[in-house]
């Protein structure tokens, strides 16, 4: 029920990664990457399918060898989400996965060989309508740039990116997006700002090697949040040393927090104090787990007392305000006569949320059993 944030998106060219539109004002796509051994086809497919269930738009798969390329063929046949092949050094791998239907090539043109090899990959991408992602990383800058700048700097990352962009420009290929990632938040942010001012290609955002589930999510939220709030970014990946499923969840949470793209429930909950009339933390944790399948956007406020509860409920799709034994219930900002038994709060609220989702989105039209007071 809150109004969308007044963020003006940077104008960028339109490309397609599979059927996913990227750039030109399209919804910001959430990407992740498998961390299985690609030659373990069953494990990789299983992980991609888990990512699909939580809403991933694009999945990147490392393809370091020709054996991995053969495995990629089998993986591609078993999943629906667009796949990006991450390739370095050996141009023949890029040609092989193109033959197998890859949706995007993540390469740096400058590190896959001489001009002839680069041209063969670009021509193959052009002939098969395959976009390319140029991926610059502060940890793997060219040696001459390290010597020139002394250390990774925004200017160094920009120069590296523009080298690869210039190669594609010379080959008259413009179906590409670019990333300039760093593990340092401010280095990454400034690098993206510089790049955004130089080219109009779509930009893929990420704070690389951000860390574990908690610290990595924090770094990514700060860095990507700054860029997204400035209208910069067309796809994103949250790089975590954790289950890739968590990357997708954090990515959508960042987009939801900025009200850029909504998917699923945005829970608004108090941190609790001695005024709480029911177990807020337990209720929120339980509902987050139970309702992961709901993709319909809605705000649900769960507040333990009447200090802030009514105000939050007024601007939420559904809201609960803690009361003695029974708690007040709101729909679309209107207080209902119905009150929830605090002991049955989780089941009652889950039922109401599912009923609301069914009303808002026909894809959720399922039988909903309401819990009696």
From Swiss-Prot:
Its EC number is 1.17.7.3. SUPFAM superfamilies: Enolase C-terminal domain-like, Nitrite and sulphite reductase 4Fe-4S domain-like. Binds 1 [4Fe-4S] cluster. Keywords: 4Fe-4S, Iron, Iron-sulfur, Isoprene biosynthesis, Metal-binding, Oxidoreductase. Its cofactor is [4Fe-4S] cluster. It comes from the Bacteria. The keyword Protein transport does not apply. Transmembrane segments: none annotated. GO terms for biological process: isopentenyl diphosphate biosynthetic process, methylerythritol 4-phosphate pathway; terpenoid biosynthetic process. [4Fe-4S] cluster binds at residues 270, 273, 305, 312. One of its GO terms (molecular function) is iron ion binding. The keyword Mitochondrion does not apply. Pathway: Isoprenoid biosynthesis; isopentenyl diphosphate biosynthesis via DXP pathway; isopentenyl diphosphate from 1-deoxy-D-xylulose 5-phosphate: step 5/6. It catalyses: (2E)-4-hydroxy-3-methylbut-2-enyl diphosphate + oxidized [flavodoxin] + H2O + 2 H(+) = 2-C-methyl-D-erythritol 2,4-cyclic diphosphate + reduced [flavodoxin]. InterPro entries: Dihydropteroate_synth-like_sf, Enolase-like_C_sf, IspG_bac, IspG_bac-typ, NO2/SO3_Rdtase_4Fe4S_sf. Converts 2C-methyl-D-erythritol 2,4-cyclodiphosphate (ME-2,4cPP) into 1-hydroxy-2-methyl-2-(E)-butenyl 4-diphosphate. Belongs to the IspG family. PANTHER family: 4-HYDROXY-3-METHYLBUT-2-EN-1-YL DIPHOSPHATE SYNTHASE (PTHR30454), 4-HYDROXY-3-METHYLBUT-2-EN-1-YL DIPHOSPHATE SYNTHASE (FERREDOXIN), CHLOROPLASTIC (PTHR30454:SF0). This is 4-hydroxy-3-methylbut-2-en-1-yl diphosphate synthase (flavodoxin). The lineage of its organism: Bacteria, Pseudomonadati, Pseudomonadota, Gammaproteobacteria, Enterobacterales.
């Amino acid at each position: 029920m809150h109004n969308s944030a007044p963020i003006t998106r940077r104008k960028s060219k339109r490309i397609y990664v599979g059927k996913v539109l990227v750039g030109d004002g399209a919804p910001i796509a959430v990407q992740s990457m498998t961390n299985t051994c690609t030659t373990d086809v069953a494990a990789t497919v299983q992980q991609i399918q888990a990512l699909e269930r939580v809403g991933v738009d694009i999945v990147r798969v490392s393809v370091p060898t020709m054996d991995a390329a053969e495995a990629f063929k089998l993986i591609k046949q078993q999943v629906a989400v667009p796949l990006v092949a991450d390739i370095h050094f050996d141009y023949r791998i890029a040609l092989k996965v193109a033959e197998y239907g890859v949706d995007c090539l993540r390469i740096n043109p400058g590190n896959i060989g001489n001009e002839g090899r680069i041209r063969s990959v670009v021509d193959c991408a052009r002939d098969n309508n395959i976009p390319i992602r140029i991926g610059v990383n502060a940890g793997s800058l060219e040696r001459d740039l390290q010597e020139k700048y002394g250390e990774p700097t925004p200017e160094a990352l920009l120069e590296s990116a523009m080298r690869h962009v210039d190669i594609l420009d010379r080959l008259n290929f413009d179906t590409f997006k670019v990333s300039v990632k760093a593990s340092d938040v401010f280095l990454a942010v400034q690098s993206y700002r510089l790049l955004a001012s130089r080219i109009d290609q779509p930009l893929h955002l990420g704070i690389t090697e951000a860390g574990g589930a908690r610290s990595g999510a924090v770094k990514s939220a700060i860095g990507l949040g700054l860029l997204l709030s400035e209208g910069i970014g067309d796809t994103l990946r949250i790089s975590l040393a954790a289950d890739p499923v968590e990357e997708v969840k954090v990515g959508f949470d960042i987009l939801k927090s900025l009200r850029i793209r909504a998917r699923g429930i945005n829970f608004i909950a108090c941190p609790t104090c001695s005024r709480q009339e029911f177990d807020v933390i337990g209720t929120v944790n339980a509902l987050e787990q139970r309702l992961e399948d709901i993709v319909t956007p809605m705000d649900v406020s769960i507040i333990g007392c009447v200090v802030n509860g009514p105000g939050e409920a007024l601007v939420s799709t559904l809201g609960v305000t803690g009361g003695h034994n029974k708690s007040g219930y709101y729909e679309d900002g209107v207080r209902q006569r119905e009150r929830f038994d605090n002991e049955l709060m989780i089941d009652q609220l889950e039922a109401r949320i599912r009923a609301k989702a069914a009303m808002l989105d026909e894809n959720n039209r399922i039988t909903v059993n309401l819990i009696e007071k």
